[in-house]
Structure formats: C-alpha cells, structure tokens
C-alpha cells in the first residue's frame, strides 16, 4: 500500500481476485517483496490476503483503530471483526483475529491511512505502529488527521434576470422601459426610471431563482409623469412651493368647524308615548 492521506474505510480477508469487492484492493506482497499469503503450508494451493478500501460506504465511516486479539480475548466495545470474502473451503486462522473501530468521518479526528505487511525482521519507526503478527507476517499501520470532504454544491439554474444583475456580466444594459410598457419575457431584469432594477412578473414565481424573493420584489415603482418634469426642473418646483399657503390652526378650525346642531336637536326630542 502506497503512502496516502486518504482514510481507510474497510478491511477484509479475501481469498481470490474473483471474490474481491470492486472497491477493495488486495495486498499480495510484503514490503520486502515476499508473498503476503496468510495460509502457510507445503504444497498449499489456497490463499488468503488482506484487502482494504478507501471508498466511503453507508454512513461514510472510517477506521480509526486496529487491534489484534487472541482467541480468548473479549471483543472490545465499539470494535468489530473485519469482513471475510473467502471461498467456502478456506478459513482464516482463529487464534489471532483482526478487529477495527469505525467512526463517522465528520466526527473522527484521526484515522488509519496506510497499512503495511512485512516479515518479522523488518522494523518501522514513527509514525508507523505495530499491530501484531499472524502466520509470520507483521501488521503495521499509519494514522493521520481526517479532513472531511467539502460538500459539492448542486448546480443551480440561474435565470437570465439574475445574470443581468451580475457585475461580471458582459451583456449590454437594456434600454429604460416605462411602467406602461408590456411585461418583458419571464426572467428578464428591467431597469426602472428611478435607477433600480426589478424582475418581471413571471420571474417572481420562478423557484429556480438563487435569491430569496419577498412579496413586493419585482413590483415596478415609478413616479407619475406629471411629477417628473417638476422634479427635473428645479425652478418650476421652487415656484410651486412659494405659492403654497400654509393655514394656521385657527383658520383650520374655522373652516372645518361643525357644531352638531342637528344631532343635538334630534337627541333632545321626546319620543312619542305608546298608546
């Protein structure tokens, strides 16, 4: 197994290439180049190899620890024996068994990233850890920090109206349209007379829009034409304000005074008695 920083997600015993899962790789040789077959014997035709996978499965769990147990040792809490993809006539030695501990990738701080098999005479220094020995082959593992994969954003459909609002857009700015003009095509951005941009009516209900739209977004707002000349011509606007007469409080009370005489007279009348 080459140096890698990708966490290992699965370990298993595999007896042949035909039984090897698609996501697994078999370790068929030690670091010295010798056979990594765990079935030893004279004229032995069967074989058992160690396989590993780095492809996330299910809950995207990674292997955070590996232990080798004797046949009388109780399986620790949180650990599980590695899988087996063997021919029915082949079995692995039970005197020593490999077990692994798995955790979700987003919660694990470190995970097993590399496994090596060697002969007994071979020694590795840090950061490799010696796990144990089975059938004359020594297990070594290297752990590394886990970096959770960045989520891949799903492609979104951006309407032409939103593209028109982008500062990076190379499209030409559309001519100014008045509010009385017919509605443009759905999804187009319309520049208004007040310098702001609005979306057409159909674009408001387009669920593919990447921005949140409120109930009033896209409603055009324009100033009535009779007031446009007044605002643009400062001299006319100033003259209109000079002719404006502001009434005093007494003038307002005198103009809108109402004594409620009719109502008071009607309330003072005595209703006819019932005969």
From Swiss-Prot:
Keywords: Cytoplasm, Endosome, Membrane, Protein transport, SH3-binding, Transport
Main location: cytoplasm
Domain UMA: 216-267
Gene Ontology cellular component terms for the protein in this record: cytosol; ESCRT I complex; late endosome membrane
Pfam families found in the cross-reference section: DUF2464
Keyword hit for Nuclease: no
Claim: NADP is one of the keywords in the record: no
GO molecular function annotations of the record: SH3 domain binding
Domain of life: Eukaryota
Annotated membrane topology: Peripheral membrane protein
Locus of motif SH3-binding: 151-156
Domain annotation MABP: ranges: 5-145
Residue runs in coiled coils: none
Gene Ontology biological process terms in this record: endosome to lysosome transport via multivesicular body sorting pathway; protein transport; receptor catabolic process; regulation of epidermal growth factor receptor signaling pathway; viral budding; virus maturation
Location(s), subcellular: Cytoplasm; Endosome; Late endosome membrane
Family: Belongs to the MVB12 family.
Functional summary from the UniProt entry: Component of the ESCRT-I complex, a regulator of vesicular trafficking process. Required for the sorting of endocytic ubiquitinated cargos into multivesicular bodies.
Quaternary structure and partners: Component of the ESCRT-I complex (endosomal sorting complex required for transport I).
Name of protein: Multivesicular body subunit 12A
Protein's gene: mvb12a
């Amino acid at each position: 197994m080459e140096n890698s920083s990708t966490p290992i997600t699965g370990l298993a015993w595999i007896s042949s290439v035909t039984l090897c899962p698609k996501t697994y790789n078999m370790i068929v040789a030690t670091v010295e180049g010798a056979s990594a077959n765990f079935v030893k014997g004279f004229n032995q035709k069967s074989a058992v190899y160690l396989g590993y996978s780095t492809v996330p499965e299910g809950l995207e769990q990674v292997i955070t620890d590996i232990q080798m147990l004797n046949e009388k040792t109780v399986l620790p809490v949180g650990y599980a024996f590695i899988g087996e993809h063997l021919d029915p006539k082949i079995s692995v030695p039970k005197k020593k068994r490999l077990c692994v501990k798995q955790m979700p990738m987003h919660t694990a701080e470190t995970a097993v990233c590399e496994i090596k098999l060697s002969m007994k005479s071979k020694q590795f220094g840090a950061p490799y850890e010696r796990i144990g020995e089975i059938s004359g082959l020594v297990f070594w593992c290297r752990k590394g920090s886990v970096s959770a994969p960045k989520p891949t954003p799903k492609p979104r459909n951006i309407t032409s109206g939103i593209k028109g609002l982008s500062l990076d857009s190379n499209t030409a700015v559309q001519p100014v349209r008045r509010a009385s003009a017919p509605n443009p095509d759905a999804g187009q951005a319309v520049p208004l007379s007040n310098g702001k941009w609005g979306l057409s009516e159909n674009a408001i209900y387009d669920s593919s829009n990447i921005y949140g739209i409120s109930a009033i977004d896209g409603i055009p707002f324009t100033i009535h034409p009779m007031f446009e000349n007044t605002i643009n011509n400062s001299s006319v606007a100033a003259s209109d304000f000079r002719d404006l007469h502001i009434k005093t409080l007494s003038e307002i009370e005198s103009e809108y005074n109402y004594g409620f005489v009719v109502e008071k007279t009607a309330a003072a009348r005595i209703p006819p008695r019932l005969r």
